[in-house]
Design a protein with these regions (language model features):
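DNA-contacting interfaces and partner/effector-binding or oligomerization modules
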Residues: 1-58, 62
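Hydrophobic micro-packing sites on short alpha-helices
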Residues: 38, 119-123
């Protein structure tokens, strides 16, 4: 089964999902206030795009027209951090990741994009917090 990679980020007031590639005949994008909502909106936008292109006579690979694909969501740090607002504090993420809290704020707002090493530190820190919470009985 083929995969369509969908990038999800946070921008201003919404989550943004987009995918592009020659096999899609363009760019598909969607926005929503919630992470689950943007995934649903993206699926709807993708179906709308495919149906419209087929009506116009555009060609797609067989795996797309046969619905033989799955969406692989790649959550950018901005969307990940924003989705955790109200659950984890930025100071706790900063403490376990070793990254300055102000820098975490820049990543959460989408004003800055972390290098791959910084992204890994943030994700490892979030995993550490979740393991610590799972030990509470």
């Amino acid at each position: 089964m083929e995969k369509i990679k969908v990038s999800i980020s946070w921008s201003g007031d919404n989550y943004c999902a987009n995918a592009q590639g020659d096999y899609l005949n363009g760019i598909i994008a969607a926005t929503h206030k919630t992470l689950e909502g943007v995934k649903q909106e993206f699926q709807s936008a993708l179906q709308f795009h495919i149906e419209g292109c087929l009506e116009d006579g555009d060609k797609f690979p067989e795996w797309i027209t046969d619905d033989n694909y799955e969406l692989e969501y790649i959550t950018e740090v901005s969307a990940l951090l924003h989705s955790l607002d109200g659950i984890l504090t930025r100071s706790s993420i900063a403490r376990v990741s070793g990254i300055n809290e102000r820098q975490i704020g820049h990543y959460a707002s989408g004003h800055r994009t972390p290098r791959p090493q910084q992204r890994e530190k943030i994700i490892n820190g979030i995993h550490k917090i979740s393991r610590d919470l799972a030990m509470v009985m």
